[in-house]
């Protein structure tokens, strides 16, 4: 009997691009008449988003926005802020044009500088850092069985995971609500931050139907310098592509907030203003199907002398998503002579996830920031705290998506002699 070989396809995920790159942004802005005039810049906070990332031929084209929120002391001696949107576009060359590419692009603020040219004009310069990753599935043929010519085969079952989706997608959510009666109608917006809860989702016909709830906190300042807080709930729902995903696939969907843009509408003196909120969010989508099949690992012939040639394959195997809360505490000395802590918040400064043999390592830094009264004037302060967590996993971590969120859970202020310290506990 003649030798007959039976082959089966194996799905291999090929990395086309995995780099960090930068895109410069800048703005020369005139303050509108209704903004208080600038006395001194306190802080420029930057949040970034990726609105679209597409592959066109041998190029990856990324469009996004850097949202800059500039805190400053007004000429009246009170804190104020103004928000500027800086759009950007970046094109990155690929080594080849992929078929059915999976695209995941993360954006971070790089260096940024902000200066007041005069009391009504701002100059902003900086760069957005982009981590671009493009992968594409490809097929490789592997021997499943051989017969004839006295062939004897040894086979073993192998898990061959097929990566259905490993990418990010940008989306926008909006909400509107009238402010509470206790807030002055002439209050100005100082800061807006948002957080989004865990997503619930269901796989239906190659789609992932996902829902979550976002909460936006508005910090407003009255004409006498008093701060007010208001919360606004915004539902988030999206239908996400995950071709091939069904109820048996291992899936994960989560949402993170890239930036929050809020505006107050002008109203009559006897009416409360409306708050309009726009959220830029990133949906993190991961879907994988595990299949087990039998493949040849050794063979010999009882009729002929045989030689073997082997080729290594990296087989994927999907595991359940890992969710981990990491408490972080920081005790922060405030500026000398500090009085009342007016406002405080927490934000991610750095984040990274690295896989290895039997573990997943999460590292980064959290920035604790706030405004405090010093000598009757507002001052900005901040403190960086590192975090690190190693999570044991079964096998070697390869393709992965890691999204980070941070939320200020608790704070307490303690006076130690002439020094004020705060202890804050966020998680991610």
Language-model segment annotations:
Residues 417-428:
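Positively charged, low-complexity/disordered segments
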């Amino acid at each position: 009997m003649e030798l007959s070989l039976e082959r089966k396809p194996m799905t291999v995920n090929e990395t086309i691009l995995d780099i960090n790159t930068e895109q410069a942004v800048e703005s020369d802005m005139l303050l509108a008449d209704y903004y208080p005039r600038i006395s001194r810049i306190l802080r420029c906070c930057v949040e970034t988003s990726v609105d679209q990332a597409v592959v066109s031929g041998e190029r990856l084209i990324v469009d996004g926005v850097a949202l800059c929120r500039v805190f400053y002391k007004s000429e009246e001696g009170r804190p104020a802020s103004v928000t500027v949107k800086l759009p950007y576009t970046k094109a990155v060359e690929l080594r080849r044009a992929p078929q059915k590419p999976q695209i995941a692009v993360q954006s971070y603020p790089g260096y940024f500088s902000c200066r007041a040219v005069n009391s009504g004009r701002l100059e902003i310069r900086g760069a957005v850092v982009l981590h671009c990753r493009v992968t594409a599935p490809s097929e490789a043929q592997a021997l499943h069985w051989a017969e004839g010519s006295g062939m004897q085969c040894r086979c073993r079952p192998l898990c061959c995971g097929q990566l259905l989706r490993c990418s990010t997608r940008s989306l926008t959510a909006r909400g509107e609500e009238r402010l509470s009666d206790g807030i002055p109608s002439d209050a100005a917006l100082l800061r807006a931050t948002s957080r989004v809860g865990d997503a619930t989702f269901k796989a239906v016909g190659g789609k992932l139907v996902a829902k979550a709830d976002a909460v936006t906190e508005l910090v407003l300042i009255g004409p006498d310098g008093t701060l007010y807080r208001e919360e606004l709930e915004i539902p988030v729902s999206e239908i996400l592509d995950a071709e091939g995903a069904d109820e048996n696939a291992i899936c994960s969907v989560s949402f993170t907030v890239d930036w929050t843009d809020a505006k107050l509408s002008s109203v009559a003196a006897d009416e409360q203003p409306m708050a309009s909120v726009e959220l830029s969010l990133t949906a993190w989508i991961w879907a994988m199907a595990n299949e087990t099949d039998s493949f040849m690992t050794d063979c010999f012939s009882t009729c002929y002398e045989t030689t073997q040639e082997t080729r290594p394959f990296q087989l994927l195997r999907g595991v359940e998503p890992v969710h981990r809360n990491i408490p972080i505490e920081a005790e922060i000395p405030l500026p000398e002579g500090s009085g009342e802590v007016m406002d405080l918040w927490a934000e991610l400064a750095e984040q990274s996830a690295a896989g290895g043999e039997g573990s997943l390592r999460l590292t980064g830094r959290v920035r604790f920031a706030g405004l405090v009264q010093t000598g009757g004037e507002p001052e900005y302060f901040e403190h960086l705290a590192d975090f690190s967590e190693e999570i044991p996993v079964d096998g070697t971590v390869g393709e992965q998506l890691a999204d980070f969120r941070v939320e200020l859970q608790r704070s307490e202020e303690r006076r130690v002699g002439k020094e004020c310290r705060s202890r804050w506990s966020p998680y991610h």
